[in-house]
C-alpha cells in the first residue's frame, strides 16, 4: 500500500506529465488550461492547487524539471567522457556544451517550454527550489570564480549564457534557422571560452 507521500508524489507527477503531454502535442504554444491538465491526469481540480499556484507555476516547475534532465544528462556524459583525464576548464565547458546541444537535438519536444520561461525559472533556481540543478549551478559558479569573477558576476554570467542559449537553441533545433544547431553550439563555445580566457 502506498504511503501518503508516495500518493502526493504520484499525483504531482501525473499533473506534470499531463501538462507536458498537452503542451508538446498542442498546435499552439500556450500553456494548457488547468481543466485540461486535471482531466488528463485523472485528478480532482482541488488537487492541482495543492501543488501549483496556477498554470504558470506548473509550467515553471515543468521547465525546471526538463532543464534539470538536460543539465544532469549533459553532466553525466561529460564526466564519463573526461573521466581520469586532466583537462582545462575550456575543454570541460566545451564538452559540457556539446552534451547540452546533443540533448537539445534529441529532445526537441520540450523546447517550446523554454522560450518564455528562462528568467522566471532562473529566479526559482537561484532560490534553491530545484535541488537537481544545484550541483551544476554551483560548479559553474566555482568555474567562473576560478577565473577571477566575483560570485555576483559569476551568477550574472550564467544567467546571460542561459538566457542566450535557450531561445537561440530553440529556433535552431526546431526550425533549423536562422543558423544550424551546430553553428550555435560553436558560437556558444567560442563565447564561453573568451569569458574564461
Where are these regions (language model features)?
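Hydrophobic alpha-helical connector segments
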Residues: 61, 76-105, 161
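Basic, amphipathic alpha-helical hairpins
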Residues: 21-29, 106, 148
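Amphipathic alpha-helical packing segments from all-alpha helical-bundle domains
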Residues: 72-75, 103, 121-148, 155-159
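Helix-turn-helix
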Residues: 25-57, 61
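Amphipathic alpha-helical segments used for helix-helix packing
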Residues: 99-123, 167-171
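Generic hydrophobic, amphipathic alpha-helix propensity
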Residues: 11-22, 37, 62-66, 70, ...
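N-terminal intrinsically disordered/low-complexity leader segments
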Residues: 1-10
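Hydrophobic/aromatic-rich alpha-helical bundle segments in the mid-to-C-terminal region
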Residues: 4, 145-191
Amino acid at each position: 500500500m502506498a504511503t501518503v507521500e508516495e500518493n502526493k508524489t504520484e499525483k504531482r507527477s501525473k499533473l506534470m506529465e499531463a501538462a507536458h503531454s498537452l503542451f508538446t502535442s498542442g498546435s499552439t504554444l500556450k500553456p494548457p488550461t488547468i481543466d485540461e491538465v486535471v482531466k488528463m491526469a485523472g485528478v480532482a481540480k482541488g488537487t492541482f492547487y495543492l501543488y501549483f499556484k496556477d498554470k504558470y507555476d506548473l509550467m515553471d516547475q515543468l521547465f525546471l524539471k526538463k532543464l534539470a534532465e538536460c543539465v544532469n544528462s549533459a553532466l553525466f556524459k561529460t564526466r564519463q567522457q573526461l573521466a581520469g583525464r586532466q583537462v582545462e576548464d575550456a575543454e570541460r565547458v566545451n564538452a559540457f556544451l556539446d552534451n547540452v546541444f546533443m540533448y537539445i537535438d534529441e529532445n526537441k519536444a520540450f523546447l517550446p517550454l523554454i522560450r518564455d520561461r528562462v528568467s522566471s525559472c532562473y529566479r526559482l533556481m537561484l532560490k534553491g527550489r530545484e535541488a537537481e540543478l544545484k550541483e551544476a549551478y554551483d560548479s559553474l559558479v566555482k568555474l567562473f570564480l576560478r577565473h577571477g569573477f566575483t560570485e555576483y558576476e559569476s551568477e550574472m554570467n550564467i544567467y546571460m549564457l542561459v538566457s542566450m542559449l535557450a531561445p537561440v537553441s530553440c529556433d535552431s533545433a526546431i526550425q533549423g534557422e536562422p543558423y544550424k544547431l551546430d553553428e550555435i553550439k560553436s558560437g556558444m563555445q567560442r563565447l564561453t571560452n573568451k569569458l574564461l580566457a
